[in-house]
Amino acid sequence: PFCNAFTGC
């Protein structure tokens, strides 16, 4: 649902 180091975007 959002961008982060684990899922990307």
Swiss-Prot record:
<comment type="function">
    <text>Cardioregulatory neurohormone that increases heart beat rate during adult wing inflation; has no effect on beat amplitude. The effect of CCAP is both ino- and chronotropic.</text>
</comment>
<feature type="disulfide bond">
    <location>
        <begin position="3"/>
        <end position="9"/>
    </location>
</feature>
<dbReference type="GO" id="GO:0005576">
    <property type="term" value="C:extracellular region"/>
</dbReference>
<protein>
    <recommendedName>
        <fullName>Cardioactive peptide</fullName>
    </recommendedName>
</protein>
<keyword id="KW-0372">Hormone</keyword>
<feature type="modified residue" description="Cysteine amide">
    <location>
        <position position="9"/>
    </location>
</feature>
<keyword id="KW-0027">Amidation</keyword>
<keyword id="KW-0527">Neuropeptide</keyword>
<dbReference type="GO" id="GO:0005179">
    <property type="term" value="F:hormone activity"/>
</dbReference>
<keyword id="KW-1015">Disulfide bond</keyword>
<dbReference type="GO" id="GO:0007218">
    <property type="term" value="P:neuropeptide signaling pathway"/>
</dbReference>
<keyword id="KW-0964">Secreted</keyword>
